[in-house]
Amino acid sequence: MSGLDGGNKLPLAQTGGLAAPDHASGDPDRDQCQGLREETEATQVMANTGGGSLETVAEGGASQDPVDCGPALRVPVAGSRGGAATKAGQEDAPPSTKGLEAASAAEAADSSQKNGCQLGEPRGPAGQKALEACGAGGLGSQMIPGKKAKEVTTKKRAISAAVEKEGEAGAAMEEKKVVQKEKKVAGGVKEETRPRAPKINNCMDSLEAIDQELSNVNAQADRAFLQLERKFGRMRRLHMQRRSFIIQNIPGFWVTAFRNHPQLSPMISGQDEDMLRYMINLEVEELKHPRAGCKFKFIFQGNPYFRNEGLVKEYERRSSGRVVSLSTPIRWHRGQDPQAHIHRNREGNTIPSFFNWFSDHSLLEFDRIAEIIKGELWPNPLQYYLMGEGPRRGIRGPPRQPVESARSFRFQSG
Protein backbone atom coordinates (compact mmCIF):
# COMPACT_ATOMS: atom_id res chain seq x y z
CA MET A 1 0.00 0.00 0.00
CA SER A 2 2.75 2.37 0.89
CA GLY A 3 4.51 1.56 -2.32
CA LEU A 4 1.43 2.27 -4.24
CA ASP A 5 1.01 5.53 -2.45
CA GLY A 6 4.53 6.40 -3.20
CA GLY A 7 3.93 5.47 -6.79
CA ASN A 8 0.98 7.74 -6.81
CA LYS A 9 3.08 10.62 -5.55
CA LEU A 10 5.90 10.13 -8.02
CA PRO A 11 3.94 11.22 -11.05
CA LEU A 12 2.97 14.40 -9.21
CA ALA A 13 6.56 15.23 -8.62
CA GLN A 14 7.39 14.39 -12.17
CA THR A 15 4.47 16.41 -13.39
CA GLY A 16 5.68 19.40 -11.38
CA GLY A 17 9.01 18.98 -13.07
CA LEU A 18 7.38 18.87 -16.47
CA ALA A 19 5.60 22.15 -15.86
CA ALA A 20 8.71 24.03 -16.87
CA PRO A 21 10.12 22.05 -19.80
CA ASP A 22 13.33 22.93 -21.46
CA HIS A 23 12.52 24.82 -24.70
CA ALA A 24 16.02 24.93 -25.89
CA SER A 25 16.10 21.48 -27.50
CA GLY A 26 13.57 20.19 -30.01
CA ASP A 27 9.97 21.24 -30.42
CA PRO A 28 8.58 22.19 -27.01
CA ASP A 29 4.99 21.42 -27.98
CA ARG A 30 5.80 17.93 -29.23
CA ASP A 31 7.92 17.11 -26.15
CA GLN A 32 5.21 18.43 -23.88
CA CYS A 33 2.51 16.31 -25.56
CA GLN A 34 4.72 13.15 -25.43
CA GLY A 35 5.50 13.65 -21.73
CA LEU A 36 1.89 14.18 -20.82
CA ARG A 37 0.87 11.06 -22.74
CA GLU A 38 3.44 8.88 -20.97
CA GLU A 39 2.48 10.29 -17.60
CA THR A 40 -1.19 9.54 -18.23
CA GLU A 41 -0.48 5.94 -19.21
CA ALA A 42 1.72 5.39 -16.14
CA THR A 43 -0.94 6.78 -13.88
CA GLN A 44 -3.59 4.46 -15.33
CA VAL A 45 -1.34 1.40 -14.90
CA MET A 46 -0.64 2.28 -11.31
CA ALA A 47 -4.34 2.79 -10.62
CA ASN A 48 -5.21 -0.57 -12.11
CA THR A 49 -2.51 -2.28 -10.08
CA GLY A 50 -3.83 -0.74 -6.84
CA GLY A 51 -7.42 -1.74 -7.66
CA GLY A 52 -8.64 1.81 -7.22
CA SER A 53 -10.28 4.34 -9.52
CA LEU A 54 -8.86 7.57 -10.82
CA GLU A 55 -10.39 10.85 -9.81
CA THR A 56 -9.59 14.30 -10.94
CA VAL A 57 -8.06 16.29 -8.10
CA ALA A 58 -6.99 19.44 -9.90
CA GLU A 59 -10.05 21.34 -11.04
CA GLY A 60 -8.14 23.28 -13.60
CA GLY A 61 -6.86 20.21 -15.55
CA ALA A 62 -8.48 18.97 -18.82
CA SER A 63 -7.63 16.24 -21.32
CA GLN A 64 -7.06 17.23 -24.82
CA ASP A 65 -6.28 15.54 -28.02
CA PRO A 66 -2.55 15.21 -28.56
CA VAL A 67 -2.91 17.05 -31.78
CA ASP A 68 -4.12 20.12 -29.89
CA CYS A 69 -1.21 19.79 -27.51
CA GLY A 70 -3.12 21.42 -24.67
CA PRO A 71 -2.13 20.95 -21.00
CA ALA A 72 -3.80 17.80 -19.53
CA LEU A 73 -3.04 17.00 -15.89
CA ARG A 74 -4.74 14.14 -14.07
CA VAL A 75 -4.03 13.06 -10.49
CA PRO A 76 -4.78 9.40 -9.53
CA VAL A 77 -6.56 8.83 -6.20
CA ALA A 78 -6.70 5.38 -4.51
CA GLY A 79 -9.99 3.59 -4.03
CA SER A 80 -11.31 1.57 -1.09
CA ARG A 81 -8.00 -0.20 -0.60
CA GLY A 82 -6.11 2.88 0.46
CA GLY A 83 -8.46 5.16 2.36
CA ALA A 84 -5.75 6.62 4.46
CA ALA A 85 -3.56 7.01 1.50
CA THR A 86 -6.36 8.67 -0.29
CA LYS A 87 -6.81 11.14 2.48
CA ALA A 88 -3.13 11.74 2.59
CA GLY A 89 -3.10 12.18 -1.15
CA GLN A 90 -5.99 14.58 -0.92
CA GLU A 91 -4.25 16.57 1.76
CA ASP A 92 -1.08 16.67 -0.23
CA ALA A 93 -2.84 17.29 -3.53
CA PRO A 94 -3.81 20.95 -3.11
CA PRO A 95 -0.25 22.25 -2.91
CA SER A 96 0.78 20.04 -5.80
CA THR A 97 -2.30 21.06 -7.71
CA LYS A 98 -1.43 24.72 -7.29
CA GLY A 99 1.99 24.06 -8.69
CA LEU A 100 0.50 22.08 -11.52
CA GLU A 101 -1.99 24.85 -12.21
CA ALA A 102 0.76 27.42 -12.42
CA ALA A 103 2.82 25.12 -14.58
CA SER A 104 -0.17 24.41 -16.80
CA ALA A 105 -0.92 28.13 -17.15
CA ALA A 106 2.67 28.92 -18.02
CA GLU A 107 2.79 26.01 -20.44
CA ALA A 108 -0.45 27.09 -22.10
CA ALA A 109 0.69 30.70 -22.35
CA ASP A 110 4.02 29.67 -23.80
CA SER A 111 2.40 27.28 -26.28
CA SER A 112 -0.21 29.85 -27.26
CA GLN A 113 2.40 32.55 -27.84
CA LYS A 114 4.43 30.23 -30.03
CA ASN A 115 1.35 29.18 -32.01
CA GLY A 116 0.39 32.85 -32.56
CA CYS A 117 -2.37 32.93 -29.91
CA GLN A 118 -2.91 35.43 -27.13
CA LEU A 119 -4.01 34.24 -23.69
CA GLY A 120 -5.06 36.24 -20.74
CA GLU A 121 -4.25 35.30 -17.16
CA PRO A 122 -6.66 32.78 -15.64
CA ARG A 123 -8.67 34.40 -12.95
CA GLY A 124 -9.69 31.91 -10.23
CA PRO A 125 -11.23 28.45 -10.63
CA ALA A 126 -13.61 29.58 -13.36
CA GLY A 127 -10.72 30.60 -15.53
CA GLN A 128 -8.94 27.31 -14.83
CA LYS A 129 -12.09 25.34 -15.77
CA ALA A 130 -12.34 27.28 -18.98
CA LEU A 131 -8.74 26.34 -19.73
CA GLU A 132 -9.56 22.69 -19.01
CA ALA A 133 -12.66 22.74 -21.23
CA CYS A 134 -10.89 24.30 -24.17
CA GLY A 135 -7.80 23.04 -25.89
CA ALA A 136 -5.05 25.03 -27.42
CA GLY A 137 -6.96 25.08 -30.69
CA GLY A 138 -10.09 26.39 -28.98
CA LEU A 139 -8.18 29.11 -27.19
CA GLY A 140 -6.50 30.07 -30.44
CA SER A 141 -9.81 30.23 -32.27
CA GLN A 142 -11.30 32.43 -29.55
CA MET A 143 -8.36 34.81 -29.47
CA ILE A 144 -8.05 35.23 -33.27
CA PRO A 145 -10.84 37.89 -33.58
CA GLY A 146 -9.19 40.01 -30.91
CA LYS A 147 -5.89 39.76 -32.71
CA LYS A 148 -7.52 40.63 -36.01
CA ALA A 149 -9.23 43.62 -34.39
CA LYS A 150 -5.94 44.74 -32.96
CA GLU A 151 -4.24 44.26 -36.31
CA VAL A 152 -7.06 46.19 -38.04
CA THR A 153 -6.78 48.96 -35.46
CA THR A 154 -3.03 49.03 -35.91
CA LYS A 155 -3.42 49.13 -39.69
CA LYS A 156 -6.00 51.91 -39.42
CA ARG A 157 -3.69 53.89 -37.18
CA ALA A 158 -0.83 53.29 -39.57
CA ILE A 159 -3.01 54.33 -42.53
CA SER A 160 -4.27 57.43 -40.71
CA ALA A 161 -0.72 58.30 -39.72
CA ALA A 162 0.39 57.79 -43.32
CA VAL A 163 -2.50 59.94 -44.56
CA GLU A 164 -1.61 62.63 -42.05
CA LYS A 165 2.01 62.45 -43.09
CA GLU A 166 1.00 62.64 -46.75
CA GLY A 167 -1.27 65.59 -45.99
CA GLU A 168 1.50 67.33 -44.10
CA ALA A 169 3.93 66.53 -46.90
CA GLY A 170 1.44 67.83 -49.48
CA ALA A 171 0.85 71.00 -47.47
CA ALA A 172 4.58 71.46 -47.11
CA MET A 173 5.03 70.96 -50.86
CA GLU A 174 2.25 73.45 -51.62
CA GLU A 175 3.79 75.94 -49.23
CA LYS A 176 7.17 75.42 -50.86
CA LYS A 177 5.61 75.93 -54.29
CA VAL A 178 3.90 79.13 -53.12
CA VAL A 179 7.16 80.38 -51.62
CA GLN A 180 9.02 79.49 -54.81
CA LYS A 181 6.39 81.27 -56.91
CA GLU A 182 6.63 84.32 -54.66
CA LYS A 183 10.39 84.22 -54.95
CA LYS A 184 10.11 83.92 -58.72
CA VAL A 185 7.65 86.81 -58.85
CA ALA A 186 9.84 88.88 -56.56
CA GLY A 187 12.86 87.94 -58.64
CA GLY A 188 10.99 88.85 -61.83
CA VAL A 189 9.97 92.19 -60.34
CA LYS A 190 13.53 92.80 -59.28
CA GLU A 191 14.75 91.82 -62.71
CA GLU A 192 12.23 94.20 -64.25
CA THR A 193 13.03 97.02 -61.84
CA ARG A 194 16.76 96.66 -62.02
CA PRO A 195 17.14 97.37 -65.73
CA ARG A 196 14.47 100.08 -65.59
CA ALA A 197 16.84 102.76 -64.38
CA PRO A 198 19.38 102.08 -67.13
CA LYS A 199 16.57 102.05 -69.70
CA ILE A 200 15.29 105.42 -68.47
CA ASN A 201 18.80 106.78 -68.49
CA ASN A 202 19.29 105.52 -72.03
CA CYS A 203 16.00 107.11 -73.09
CA MET A 204 16.94 110.40 -71.48
CA ASP A 205 20.32 110.30 -73.16
CA SER A 206 18.62 109.61 -76.49
CA LEU A 207 16.18 112.48 -75.98
CA GLU A 208 18.98 114.84 -75.04
CA ALA A 209 20.92 113.76 -78.10
CA ILE A 210 17.87 114.33 -80.32
CA ASP A 211 17.27 117.75 -78.76
CA GLN A 212 20.87 118.65 -79.38
CA GLU A 213 20.56 117.52 -82.99
CA LEU A 214 17.37 119.55 -83.41
CA SER A 215 19.10 122.58 -81.93
CA ASN A 216 21.92 122.11 -84.39
CA VAL A 217 19.45 121.77 -87.27
CA ASN A 218 17.57 124.89 -86.14
CA ALA A 219 20.83 126.80 -85.90
CA GLN A 220 21.74 125.66 -89.41
CA ALA A 221 18.28 126.67 -90.64
CA ASP A 222 18.66 130.11 -89.07
CA ARG A 223 22.02 130.58 -90.70
CA ALA A 224 20.69 129.36 -94.02
CA PHE A 225 17.63 131.59 -93.64
CA LEU A 226 19.80 134.62 -92.99
CA GLN A 227 21.89 133.84 -96.00
CA LEU A 228 18.79 133.40 -98.16
CA GLU A 229 17.23 136.50 -96.67
CA ARG A 230 20.24 138.56 -97.51
CA LYS A 231 20.52 137.04 -100.95
CA PHE A 232 16.89 137.53 -101.86
CA GLY A 233 16.84 140.81 -99.97
CA ARG A 234 19.36 142.18 -102.42
CA MET A 235 17.29 140.86 -105.29
CA ARG A 236 14.12 142.43 -103.86
CA ARG A 237 15.89 145.69 -103.25
CA LEU A 238 16.51 146.13 -106.92
CA HIS A 239 12.85 145.59 -107.68
CA MET A 240 11.81 147.86 -104.83
CA GLN A 241 13.96 150.67 -106.16
CA ARG A 242 12.37 150.37 -109.57
CA ARG A 243 8.91 150.23 -107.96
CA SER A 244 9.63 153.32 -105.85
CA PHE A 245 10.78 155.24 -108.91
CA ILE A 246 7.51 154.45 -110.71
CA ILE A 247 5.30 155.24 -107.66
CA GLN A 248 6.89 158.69 -107.29
CA ASN A 249 5.48 159.57 -110.70
CA ILE A 250 1.91 158.64 -109.63
CA PRO A 251 0.38 161.51 -107.66
CA GLY A 252 -1.43 160.49 -104.44
CA PHE A 253 -0.49 156.83 -104.73
CA TRP A 254 0.34 156.22 -101.07
CA VAL A 255 -2.46 158.27 -99.62
CA THR A 256 -4.88 156.26 -101.76
CA ALA A 257 -3.35 152.97 -100.64
CA PHE A 258 -3.57 154.03 -96.95
CA ARG A 259 -7.12 155.23 -97.31
CA ASN A 260 -8.28 152.05 -99.08
CA HIS A 261 -6.81 149.73 -96.50
CA PRO A 262 -9.71 148.50 -94.34
CA GLN A 263 -7.77 148.63 -91.06
CA LEU A 264 -5.72 151.79 -91.63
CA SER A 265 -8.58 153.90 -92.99
CA PRO A 266 -10.35 154.35 -89.59
CA MET A 267 -7.07 155.69 -88.13
CA ILE A 268 -6.72 158.47 -90.71
CA SER A 269 -8.48 161.79 -90.24
CA GLY A 270 -9.22 164.42 -92.90
CA GLN A 271 -6.17 166.50 -91.91
CA ASP A 272 -3.98 163.35 -91.89
CA GLU A 273 -5.16 162.59 -95.40
CA ASP A 274 -4.15 166.08 -96.55
CA MET A 275 -0.66 165.66 -95.12
CA LEU A 276 -0.25 162.16 -96.65
CA ARG A 277 -0.91 163.60 -100.11
CA TYR A 278 2.64 164.96 -100.02
CA MET A 279 4.08 161.52 -99.35
CA ILE A 280 6.01 160.29 -102.39
CA ASN A 281 7.74 157.16 -101.10
CA LEU A 282 7.63 154.54 -98.37
CA GLU A 283 10.54 152.33 -97.40
CA VAL A 284 10.52 149.43 -94.94
CA GLU A 285 13.98 148.21 -94.09
CA GLU A 286 14.77 145.26 -91.93
CA LEU A 287 17.77 145.45 -89.68
CA LYS A 288 20.82 143.23 -90.09
CA HIS A 289 19.03 140.41 -88.33
CA PRO A 290 15.45 140.10 -89.56
CA ARG A 291 14.23 139.28 -86.07
CA ALA A 292 16.05 142.23 -84.51
CA GLY A 293 13.60 144.83 -85.78
CA CYS A 294 12.81 147.04 -88.71
CA LYS A 295 12.76 150.66 -89.81
CA PHE A 296 9.95 152.62 -91.50
CA LYS A 297 10.86 155.68 -93.58
CA PHE A 298 8.24 158.09 -94.96
CA ILE A 299 9.49 160.43 -97.70
CA PHE A 300 7.58 163.74 -98.25
CA GLN A 301 7.69 166.64 -100.60
CA GLY A 302 7.81 170.12 -99.27
CA ASN A 303 4.49 170.88 -97.56
CA PRO A 304 2.90 173.55 -95.37
CA TYR A 305 2.60 171.21 -92.35
CA PHE A 306 6.15 170.28 -91.27
CA ARG A 307 9.71 170.90 -92.34
CA ASN A 308 11.00 167.29 -92.32
CA GLU A 309 11.62 165.66 -95.70
CA GLY A 310 11.59 162.25 -94.08
CA LEU A 311 10.00 160.82 -90.97
CA VAL A 312 11.56 157.64 -89.48
CA LYS A 313 9.97 155.15 -87.11
CA GLU A 314 12.23 152.33 -85.90
CA TYR A 315 11.51 149.22 -83.84
CA GLU A 316 14.44 147.54 -82.21
CA ARG A 317 14.58 144.34 -80.21
CA ARG A 318 16.89 144.63 -77.24
CA SER A 319 19.03 141.87 -75.76
CA SER A 320 16.43 141.38 -73.02
CA GLY A 321 13.89 140.51 -75.73
CA ARG A 322 11.85 143.66 -75.24
CA VAL A 323 11.06 145.67 -78.38
CA VAL A 324 11.35 149.42 -78.18
CA SER A 325 10.40 152.11 -80.68
CA LEU A 326 12.32 155.18 -81.69
CA SER A 327 11.20 158.00 -84.01
CA THR A 328 12.31 161.25 -85.54
CA PRO A 329 10.81 164.37 -83.93
CA ILE A 330 8.49 166.23 -86.30
CA ARG A 331 9.21 169.92 -86.80
CA TRP A 332 5.81 171.45 -87.31
CA HIS A 333 5.08 174.76 -88.87
CA ARG A 334 3.42 177.23 -86.62
CA GLY A 335 -0.15 176.23 -85.88
CA GLN A 336 0.02 172.88 -87.66
CA ASP A 337 0.68 170.69 -84.67
CA PRO A 338 -1.94 167.93 -84.66
CA GLN A 339 -2.39 168.37 -80.92
CA ALA A 340 -3.97 171.78 -81.68
CA HIS A 341 -6.65 170.25 -83.87
CA ILE A 342 -9.51 167.79 -83.38
CA HIS A 343 -9.22 164.86 -85.74
CA ARG A 344 -12.17 162.91 -86.97
CA ASN A 345 -12.24 159.96 -89.33
CA ARG A 346 -14.69 159.42 -92.19
CA GLU A 347 -17.24 157.99 -89.80
CA GLY A 348 -17.11 161.20 -87.75
CA ASN A 349 -15.48 159.59 -84.74
CA THR A 350 -12.90 161.57 -82.83
CA ILE A 351 -9.54 159.90 -83.19
CA PRO A 352 -5.91 160.76 -82.54
CA SER A 353 -3.91 161.96 -85.49
CA PHE A 354 -2.12 159.36 -87.55
CA PHE A 355 1.08 161.37 -87.18
CA ASN A 356 0.97 160.86 -83.44
CA TRP A 357 2.34 157.43 -84.28
CA PHE A 358 5.75 159.09 -84.73
CA SER A 359 5.72 160.82 -81.38
CA ASP A 360 3.49 158.77 -79.07
CA HIS A 361 4.88 155.36 -78.19
CA SER A 362 2.27 154.35 -75.63
CA LEU A 363 -0.78 153.50 -77.73
CA LEU A 364 -1.17 149.85 -78.64
CA GLU A 365 -3.06 150.70 -81.79
CA PHE A 366 0.01 152.50 -83.03
CA ASP A 367 1.92 149.25 -82.70
CA ARG A 368 -0.82 147.72 -84.79
CA ILE A 369 -0.05 150.33 -87.50
CA ALA A 370 3.53 149.09 -87.74
CA GLU A 371 2.41 145.48 -88.14
CA ILE A 372 -0.09 146.35 -90.90
CA ILE A 373 2.37 148.43 -92.85
CA LYS A 374 5.13 145.87 -92.64
CA GLY A 375 3.02 142.80 -93.27
CA GLU A 376 0.34 143.96 -95.68
CA LEU A 377 0.79 147.37 -97.22
CA TRP A 378 4.47 147.38 -97.98
CA PRO A 379 4.73 143.96 -99.72
CA ASN A 380 1.97 144.78 -102.22
CA PRO A 381 0.71 148.38 -102.16
CA LEU A 382 -0.70 148.13 -105.66
CA GLN A 383 -3.62 145.94 -104.66
CA TYR A 384 -4.76 148.53 -102.08
CA TYR A 385 -4.25 151.39 -104.48
CA LEU A 386 -6.44 149.64 -107.04
CA MET A 387 -8.98 148.51 -104.49
CA GLY A 388 -11.13 151.62 -105.09
CA GLU A 389 -10.86 151.16 -108.86
CA GLY A 390 -11.25 147.42 -108.78
CA PRO A 391 -14.29 147.08 -111.03
CA ARG A 392 -12.86 149.50 -113.55
CA ARG A 393 -9.35 148.07 -113.55
CA GLY A 394 -10.62 144.51 -113.62
CA ILE A 395 -8.69 143.17 -110.61
CA ARG A 396 -9.22 139.45 -110.41
CA GLY A 397 -9.00 137.23 -107.38
CA PRO A 398 -7.98 138.06 -103.80
CA PRO A 399 -5.00 140.30 -103.10
CA ARG A 400 -1.67 138.61 -103.57
CA GLN A 401 -0.02 137.67 -100.29
CA PRO A 402 3.71 137.98 -99.75
CA VAL A 403 5.84 134.88 -100.01
CA GLU A 404 6.88 135.18 -96.37
CA SER A 405 4.36 136.26 -93.81
CA ALA A 406 5.35 139.23 -91.75
CA ARG A 407 6.66 138.66 -88.26
CA SER A 408 4.98 140.39 -85.37
CA PHE A 409 7.43 142.29 -83.24
CA ARG A 410 4.93 143.20 -80.50
CA PHE A 411 6.04 146.81 -80.80
CA GLN A 412 6.23 148.55 -77.46
CA SER A 413 7.18 151.98 -76.33
CA GLY A 414 10.76 152.53 -75.28
UniProtKB/Swiss-Prot annotation:
One of its GO terms (cellular component) is nucleus. GO terms for biological process: nucleosome assembly. One of its GO terms (molecular function) is chromatin binding. InterPro entries: NAP-like_sf, NAP_family. Signal peptide: none annotated. Residues 1-129, 391-414 are annotated as: Disordered. Gene3D superfamilies: 1.20.5.1500, Nucleosome assembly protein. Residues 24-40 have a biased composition (Basic and acidic residues). Pfam families: NAP. Residues 101-112 have a biased composition (Low complexity). Transmembrane segments: none annotated. Belongs to the nucleosome assembly protein (NAP) family. PANTHER family: TESTIS-SPECIFIC Y-ENCODED PROTEIN. This is Testis-specific Y-encoded-like protein 4. It comes from Homo sapiens. The gene is TSPYL4.
